[in-house]
Amino acid sequence: MKKILFKLGLSCFTLLAVGGCNDSLLEKFPLDQITNETFWNTENDLAVYNTTLYNLVRNDVAVPIMMGHTDGFNSHFGSIWQQDELSDNLATREARHIFFQQIRAGKHNIPSNPDWFGYQGWNFIRAINVGLANYDKAAIPQATKDKYAAEARLFRGWFYAEKAAKYGDVPYVERELSVDSEELYAARTPRKEAMQKVLADLNFAVEKLPANWGDGNAPGRLNRWAALLVKARVCLYEGTFNKYHGAGDSKMWLEEAAKAAKELMDKGPYRLYNTGKPDSDYNAYHRILDLTGNPEVISWRKYKTGVINNHVQSYFSYTGGATKSLVEDYLCTDGLPISLSPLYKGDEKFEDVFENRDPRLRQTVLHPADTQKYNYHLGDGRSYPRLLGVPGGGYQTTTGYHIIKHYNADDMIGKAFNTGESPAITLRFAEALLTYAEAMAELGTITQADLDISINKLRDRVKMPHMKIGSIPVDPRYTKDGVSPLIVEIRRERRIELFMEGHRYNDLKRWKQGKKLEIPTM
């Protein structure tokens, strides 16, 4: 009997001792709720969590990195198509877009005037850091955990690169904070240090992301090729910014940009969209509603009536019109700028502007003879171009240069206002070609072979003459830019190819060419 009592007592003591030393035995989490302690178990848990990051990045005003077409109240300005209004590419006509005009004119005062883009989004960083602190809890292979961590770190690096480009020094946070965290009151992280952390995030993403998530290039998750293009973009910005602003090392950044772009070009599954129609392919590519499987598109955002609408088609006229500066940058068909080419017919007659010019001009700006082709507001029978103040309905412009790139009448006819389905291309292969050529030129190591696998691929699509290192024209319009004629021409190609895709303002910033915004361009 004593032996039985002794064993029973010992058992009770052991249970109490263990219970007293291990609080986890007493911790019980709700079975009908998701908690941080019980959530991180399977790959599906990590995939579901990272999907919330894509939901957050949809807010283009708060997180302007993977820009598409913001819906709701901000839809009239929160689109990738409208960002060129900050630059010398567009002449906005809309009073609601005064912000773009103020920025361009250098009259946007901080902090008396609120910013529209990029000062918010810190909940996005918190969500990323929470995920990174918990992915390892899942009972799945390390390589699987790493690819979701890579997805989050790609977003974090991209976010902070945008912040550094906008503000310079920036508060860099890489862990979940509480109300007592000292980082809440810390000074901003120096730009150089922050950008090293950005590069580490992007390198991790390139190394760990899968080449294919198995989605068939649906508008789904960012893959390794997307990470390479984001890295190339960020490194090109940092390299040229440092070079022209005397802000630090440029060589390393330019080498990283060229290396990332070249790897995407050599090993990625992408190529330029080309059906062999130089007079229409460029425009047609930017009007495709479903980009699934498109060979040039690396990442895109899909819109569907009744799910997520593209409101921006309804505000297309707010862009005002292309500037004369942009139109004059298109080369003639002999490969020479209008200032040097005998083929240029002048602009006394509007139609002459399009004669003997790079086919991308007529696929970007409306030729009066193409109104039927693009179904461009034909209801009142009046001709185009139309300027503000001139009688007539339809779209009116500040410049006469009506934009048809991205314009898709078929996506508006028969639909209610603010309901469209035109997608947003966020990353495309052509940018890699342009980035590679520019980085190699800035490094001073570019060869004809480099041009042939980059810039000249873009020219082949529209049957324009190749750029030749030994015969680069010296355009008198750019002799005061302080760069070589070769770099002038590579920058010109970038401006033409990526018009109205949200690059021009940042390009002018990194090149230290803000003076171009002081010149009347309409």
What is the predicted role of each segment?
Residues 43-47, 51, 55-65, 88-167, ...:
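Conserved, well-structured interaction surfaces
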Residues 169-191, 241-255:
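Short coil/linker segments at helix-helix boundaries
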Residues 430-436, 446-474:
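Active/binding-pocket-proximal capping segment
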